[in-house]
A protein has these predicted regions:
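Acidic, divalent-metal-binding catalytic cores of TOPRIM
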Residues: 1-181
Length: 181
């Protein structure tokens, strides 16, 4: 299965989301590319979900979104007028790798269990901007194991709900999914 309208930025985000959904998604190279595709591109007037790092870069298009919920490491946003959703991953001003480390800890494992560095800078260096990340057996094993994490399971549920309901999303139902423990 392929979800073209689900657009993660960077390779580790794409690898995790594809693993969680057990499907292909539409990789974008940056948060700006995700926003541009939603605001002016193919999905301008269509359903779309962007998945971006919650980093320091401010994207003007995101100012048209309202927060509909959050977890420790995920912020869920909905466009005021369109069927556009954005999920910011990680704590504020942090990259996806902080989300990964947090959720690996949540399932009682360590990065070393996947033969990956526990040092954040080293992990970022290993996972950033590399097509090989999507085929790396260590990364794939990590992403599969992370499905056990309650927060990753919530991400999976929200993405599956959005993909199944595209133009018929019940915001109250979505908020309940996000708030559920």
């Amino acid at each position: 299965m392929k979800y073209n309208e689900i657009m993660p930025e960077c390779f580790i985000d794409t690898t995790l989301v594809a693993s969680v959904l057990d499907a292909k998604v539409s990789h974008k190279h940056s948060c700006n590319e995700v926003a541009r595709e939603m605001e002016k591109g193919k999905y301008k007037d269509a359903f779309a979900v962007g998945i971006i790092d919650n980093d320091k870069r401010k994207i003007s298009y995101i100012e048209s979104f309202d927060e509909i919920g959050r977890t420790d490491n995920l912020t869920f946003l909905k466009h005021r007028d369109k069927h556009h959703y954005v999920i910011k991953v990680g704590k504020e001003h942090k990259a996806m790798e902080t989300f990964i480390k947090s959720n690996v800890d949540a399932i009682g494992m360590k990065m070393e269990d996947f033969d990956l560095p526990s040092d954040l800078a080293e992990l970022i260096e290993q996972t950033k901007d590399s097509v090989s990340t999507q085929k790396d057996p260590k990364i794939l094993k990590l992403c599969k194991a992370m499905r056990q994490s309650p927060e990753v399971a919530k991400l999976q549920d929200v993405l599956a709900y959005l993909a199944a309901n595209k133009y018929n999303v019940d915001i109250d139902e979505l908020k309940k999914m996000i708030e559920a423990r």
